[in-house]
Amino acid sequence: MVRSMQSENKYRPLTAKQALQLAAPHTWAASVCPSLFGICYSRLMGFPLGPFRAAAVLAACVFLQSAVNTLNDYVDFVKGTDSASDNVEVSDAVLVYGGIDPKSARNLGFLYLFAGLLSGLAASAGAGPVPLLIGAAGGATVLLYSGGPLPVSSLPLGEVVSGFVMGGLIPLGTAACADGKLHPEILFYSLPLIIGIGLIMMSNNGCDIEKDIRAGRRTLPMFLGRERTLKLYRFLTVFWILLLFVLPVLLTGRRGFLCGVLLLLFARERFRNILALQLRPEQRVLQMKGIVAANIFGNGALIVTLMAAVLMEALHA
């Protein structure tokens, strides 16, 4: 009993700054970009998505992303997967360096999940069962991503699942919140988001091959090996870039050429950086910063292009 009390007393209280660090705002692009894409797509297609629903969708996505990040950090720490020797930044490893009770992080993760659930219910209120079913699939993925007997993040399908759920289901659910209908065609135009987000996980797993082998994880890079993973990574990156040039034109006509201009001006160096790296453990911090930046500036160019198209249509209405 005394030992248990001493163990509890050694922990520091969770601060607001640490709660924000566990939410990992630098990764929110993986949820914000798909949400904004779905909002802009809905406006372009004439779906009745009002500002309240749009804001609620955006909030739900941010809270669910925060829940994924927090619960994933908790599970990795409890399992001993994350340590100070694993090339992680101090601000990105609160449980490793912060001295807080892991249970506090777990509870915070569930709080983020609950907030995301409430925001999602607000966004889909009165829209029928379709957005609720899509949201339920996303919520189940959040819970199964790091937890359960067979976590999604530890499977070879992790990249596909994370890319499809974040990059595909978020836009699909956003459009469904507008009119209660299923719009599967949005998944085609969401391909840059699906690939970009999937590559975030591949960046992490590609750098962590040796660490994941020790932890008993069966990730895709572990099966492929670093050399073949790197080839696949670079192929998908080039394909992602090509889609960013082509799909906006297919979706918005000549206005879509703006995306290519923005890519050349702001995203070229970001893509060049991630193509030059080799998914080595010692490059993990650079690799993760690079792929997040590529998502922000690459998929961000797509979002800005759609926003401009929406604005131009509003001005000509």
Label each residue range with its predicted role.
Residues 36-37, 46-74, 133-140, 184-203:
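Membrane-embedded alpha-helical segments that form the functional core of polytopic membrane enzymes
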